[in-house]
Structure formats: structure tokens, C-alpha cells
């Protein structure tokens, strides 16, 4: 089926002075927009419990934003920013952050024209000893560069990023990252490193709000989706359907699939990253039905969700996925997706 979305329908004026450059002192004091029965009203986030349906189970994305921006220099002095997007070798996120000595990442490189060859360096001191991180271009991966990092310090790559990297805040804030961003541009429930942008809907939760919701009977579950830099990419084509969606990696535990089935009809996804993860499960399950395997190494395609028959329900999809994980003794399913959910014509599954 041919699809067309006129991107001009989504144009609107957003004056710079209307963009909050810094968070409120209290996360949950932010405004909450409520849509109910065709009417829009305004509330506060700390009153979220008043708006949730009885028996709700919130699904959080527990990804953690990494200090992905590294400012490096050529021996000539040229300043070049290396923005780490996703691990290349090793490709597994957990291993990529735990590795020592060398690794390779898919990166966006600022001022790339100044980096034709040779190493970029950043000098630092560890326990009084001079150290150095070096970066080499080793190839391209579409719009990104494959960059190999090497170092002698007894640090993991994750520890190096914590020491030398900067937090990547949204470009529309039009400011440099500051100390406050290292704590406030993270959700309070973030656990697993890998994102270059925060799952922003979750930024307004506080431990106190989560505790009060739990006391009121709200349940919680978590998925992990590492948000990619493509979330900031503008749609440049007049037809949004011709915009190539970026790849994002996600994982879900078998116990989570079990609880989704147990709480079917009461699932409330927190933010679009949780939505994208949950909806992608239907495509993986449909692959199992058709091919006998979810083929996790193949990203869920941009329009793959639309190829699933209307008769195939979300509950069936979760049951199919759970049975596959049980047969193969999988505690966690890891996959990736490039899906686009358009405003008209999409049938929600989960």
C-alpha cells in the first residue's frame, strides 16, 4: 500500500522563549496535559495518579543516557567532536562498556573535514599518571563513521566515557551541557547504559511519586530501549514516509512478557520509547508464526508492523513470544527496530 504523510501538516510556531532551557527544581511539579473524551485539560505531573485507570501497570524504559560526546584534538590543534552512537566491536552494549584497551563505535563526527587521517587524542591524568585516549577512523557505516578507540589506562570504556565524555542534551535547547544535566537528564529509574537521548516522558517521575503510585495499587514493569541520535534528526522530505527511520536496540525480559499478559488491558506505556518497544514485539512474534524464529539480528522494518494481519491480536503476539522464549530457555530477548507509527491507519497491538 502506498503511504503519504504531508510533513507540512505538522508545522507549528515554537518561539525559543517558550522552550524550557532548564528543568524545574522539582521533577514532578511539571505540567501534565490530559486528553479525555475529546477534551484537553491541564494538570500537574504529581497528580498523575488521579488520571490513571484503575489497575494500571506502568511500563518504564530503564535505559541510561551515556556521556556520548567526546571533545578530541588533532596534533595540529583542530578541535573535533566524536559523538558515540552505538557499539560496533564488540556490538553488545554490556560488553562494549566493560571492555578495556580498545573498542570500535559507530559515531557522528563533528568537523569531519578536518580529520582526513591519523589519530585524534585527548590527554588526561589518572591517579597522577598522564594517560591518553586515541581515536582512529576505520570506515563508514551509512551516515556514520566507524571509530576505533585505544587506551592504556586500566579503565573500561564506560569508565572512560564517565571521565571524559559530555552528556548529549537536545539540540533545540541551544545551550551547552552543564553539571545539572548529568543528574537531571536521566530518569530516576535508569539502569542500563546505552542511550544518547533520555526517554523524556519519564524525566518527571520522582522516587516519592513512584512510591505513592505503588501504594495506590499501580504496578510497574520495565523494558530497555537505547534511544539513538536519529531521534533528533529532522524530516527533510515533504513526504514523511520517505524519511528513513534510524535503528534502535531494545531488550525485554521473559518475566516482563509474562506480566504484560497477566496485566493485559491495563498496560500504560511511559513515553514513546516504551511504546516503540512494546509495539515491535508484535512484529517479532509474527515472524515466529511465519518463520519459526523472530530473527533478532534483523531490525523490525519501518513498515513491518503494517504487514501483520488485523486478525492477529496483541495478546496472541505476547503468547507466541513467551512460548518461543520458554522453548529456547531465553531469559531476555534482544532485538532492534526502525518502526514508524503514522497518525492514521495504525492499529495498536499491545
Task: Give the residues covered by each predicted segment.
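Surface-exposed, charge/polar-rich loops and edge strands
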Residues: 1-350
